[in-house]
UniProtKB/Swiss-Prot annotation:
Protein name: Chaperone protein HscA homolog
Keyword Chaperone: yes
Top-level taxonomic group: Bacteria
InterPro entries registered for this protein in UniProt: ATPase_NBD, Heat_shock_70_CS, HscA_NBD, HSP70_C_sf, HSP70_peptide-bd_sf, Hsp_70_fam, ISC_FeS_clus_asmbl_HscA
Species assigned in the record: Neisseria gonorrhoeae (strain ATCC 700825 / FA 1090)
Gene Ontology molecular function: ATP binding; ATP hydrolysis activity; ATP-dependent protein folding chaperone; unfolded protein binding
Keyword Chaperone: yes
Record-linked PROSITE patterns: HSP70_1, HSP70_2, HSP70_3
Sorted UniProt keywords: ATP-binding, Chaperone, Nucleotide-binding
Length: 620
């Protein structure tokens, strides 16, 4: 019988039993990682005490990679190899960017399926750029927490489509992260506010980040977070305010085309001016371009507001639609939660306050609130806290359907459907003798397929030849908790079936991702061996401490040979701790455990006798 071991409260005897989880806000401008410690969520700082990590990656000549502040500082001088705002590019194509590529200081490839960025280290995709940011946050979390993360919750804009969500998960895979859940950013903010403040009622989350805008209408009741409606624009954010000020600067100085270095220089300066106008009434932009031209332009807060007021008003249209979808009037909204660094702009706050007739909530840092909510959710999903205390009901932001005859889009799952969910609908053949059917999966609100986003196609074969309209094909759509889609089609009379897990053709196929994982995980085997040994060492030390403590108390229960055998086994185990392999250490642990079985039984009998001494039968 092995010695019974009870660890001290709050202590974990083995690293594999200690479940470390984190929430990650993968942002356009800045990214953060947070975790729950001692019952409360907190963002984790870097070595310099900064919790925000600039979402900037630089590729160096020597093959190295810089991420964060050091990369940001080189953006002006090395724009072609320094990538920022990758979140605006992830899961998108060149066609999605429309006319906005001209002010982005990158060399885009001509691939039509996904975006390519040419750097000195070769072609990079937004997925790979995002993976470097996630790797840095992973390292920060694991160094701070002193162990490996079992999983993370990564936040995404509520209006991210299937391609953008899948691309985000692929970036996490490249970074070596286990994604417990993709969580909509407004929902994460609601979790942070709801749990911190025990709020109840109807709330609106207004989330204006660096590259995206989301709005969600939520009903918060005790223990329930229900998203009633969501909306937004995944291509509207603080970057657009920068772009408008950038264009104004060009107009004022009669400039047209700039090289990449000058473009990056002016973009960084207008971004700084925008931030300055948050607290000051005037900002001055001064620069010398590569051709020697001097720029010296002042702009007042009022001028900046006039230049960008149309962008602010553009955010209110999805707000109105979300309220309409939720069946909620402005006067029924108990509070408006402001999320995202761009909500610091005074005219944004004023517009929201005027629209709702109330001062928005800002008692949590708008830069941190999303990461905090993600950390709380990660803590639950990792099993560190029972999720019976609260229930999260999220929704899908866009309708999902398929193409029917005539290029029409038939909606299967309407937008604002609570997820996870599954819906089925029956379809039939169009021609006599038709034996196959192509299922074209689309996403969007428009009636025509040409106006919706194509997600995937697959073919159901083996349909029995019948008259047109006689066959019955049941198509089932399933959305998981991450908002990712799978579709199946089954002919009802024969049971023949086809299905697909929708992986949009934004770029990286499984083989490519697998190869990237192999390239980035060259030391994975060594890492696993080291972890296995560390776990074995912890187990060995725990057993040795327990045996030594027992010997101090009850060694008189052993005869000389038993005592000597236990001592020899302890010495053997300690000797293997120095340089033994995991399997050698575990073998020695098993041997010591066997040699102490009889000792453990004798100790238990003694303790039972002590407990019963002086007790009558009636008291037992």
């Amino acid at each position: 019988m092995a010695l019974l071991q009870i660890s001290e409260p709050g202590m974990s005897a083995a690293p594999h039993r200690h479940r470390l989880a984190a929430g990650i806000d993968l942002g356009t401008t800045n990214s953060l990682v947070a975790t729950v410690r001692s019952g409360s969520a907190a963002c984790l700082p870097d070595a310099d005490g900064r919790v925000t990590l600039p979402s900037v990656v630089r590729y160096l000549e020597n093959g190295g990679i810089e991420v964060g502040k050091t990369a940001l500082s080189a953006q002006k001088t090395d724009p072609l190899n320094t990538v920022s705002s990758a979140k605006r590019l992830i899961g998108r194509t060149l066609a999605d960017l429309h006319q906005n590529t001209h002010y982005l200081p990158y060399r885009f490839g001509d691939n039509q399926r996904f975006i390519e960025l040419h750097t000195r280290q070769g072609v990079k995709t937004p997925v790979e750029v995002s993976a470097e940011i996630l790797k840095t946050l992973k390292l920060r979390a694991e160094e701070t927490l002193g162990g490996d993360l079992v999983g993370v919750v990564i936040t995404v804009p509520a209006y991210f489509d299937d391609a953008q969500r899948q691309a985000t998960k692929d970036a996490a895979r490249l970074a070596g992260l286990n994604v417990l859940r993709l969580l909509n950013e407004p929902t994460a903010a609601a979790i942070a506010y709801g749990l911190d403040n025990a709020s109840e009622g109807t709330f609106v989350v207004y989330d204006l980040g660096g590259g995206t805008f989301d709005v969600s209408v939520l009903q918060l009741t005790k223990g329930l977070f229900e998203v009633k409606a969501t909306g937004g624009n995944s291509a509207l954010g603080g970057d657009d305010f920068d772009h408008r000020l950038f264009c104004y600067l060009l107009e004022q100085n009669r400039l047209s085309q700039l090289n990449e270095q000058d473009s990056q220089l002016l973009l960084s300066l207008v971004r700084a001016a925008k931030e300055q106008l948050t607290t000051q009434t005037e900002a001055r932009i001064q620069a010398t371009l590569s051709d020697g031209m001097a720029i010296d332009t002042s702009i007042s807060r009022a001028e900046f507001h006039n230049l960008t007021q149309h962008l602010v008003m553009k955010t209110l249209e999805p707000v109105k639609q979300a309220l309409k979808d939720a069946g909620v009037g402005k006067n029924e909204v108990k509070g408006v939660v402001m999320v995202g660094g761009s909500t610091r702009m005074p005219h944004v706050q004023q517009a929201v306050a005027t629209f709702f007739g109330q001062t928005p909530l800002n008692n949590l840092n708008p830069d941190e609130v999303v990461a905090l909510g993600a950390a709380i959710q990660a803590n639950v999903l990792a099993g560190n806290k029972a999720d019976g205390e609260w229930l999260l009901l999220d929704v899908t932001p866009l309708s999902l359907g398929l193409e029917t005859y005539g290029g029409l889009a038939e909606k299967i799952i309407p937008r604002n459907s609570t997820i996870p969910t599954a819906r089925a609908q029956d379809f039939t053949t169009f021609k006599d003798g038709q034996t196959a059917m192509t299922i074209h999966v689309v996403q969007g609100e428009r009636e025509l397929v040409s106006d919706c986003r194509s997600l995937a196609k697959f073919t159901l074969r083996g349909i029995p030849p019948m008259a047109a309209g006689a066959a019955r094909i049941r198509v089932t759509f399933q959305i998981d908790a991450d908002g990712l889609l799978s579709v199946s089609a089954q002919e009802q009379s024969t049971g023949v079936q086809a299905q697909i897990e929708v992986k949009p053709s934004y770029g990286l196929d499984d083989d490519t991702i697998t190869q990237m994982l192999k390239d980035s995980m060259g030391n994975a085997a060594e890492d696993m061996a080291a972890r296995a040994r560390a776990e074995a060492v912890v187990e060995a030390e725990s057993l040795t401490d327990a045996v030594n403590a027992a010997l101090e108390l009850d060694s008189d229960l052993l005869d000389a040979e038993e005592f000597a055998q236990i001592q020899r086994d302890i010495a053997d185990l300690q000797g293997r701790l120095k340089d033994g392999k995991a399997e050698d250490i575990r073998a020695a642990v098993a041997k010591l455990s066997r040699s102490t079985d009889n000792f453990a039984a004798k100790r238990m009998n003694r303790n039972i006798q002590r407990a019963l001494t002086g007790q009558s039968v009636d008291n037992i």
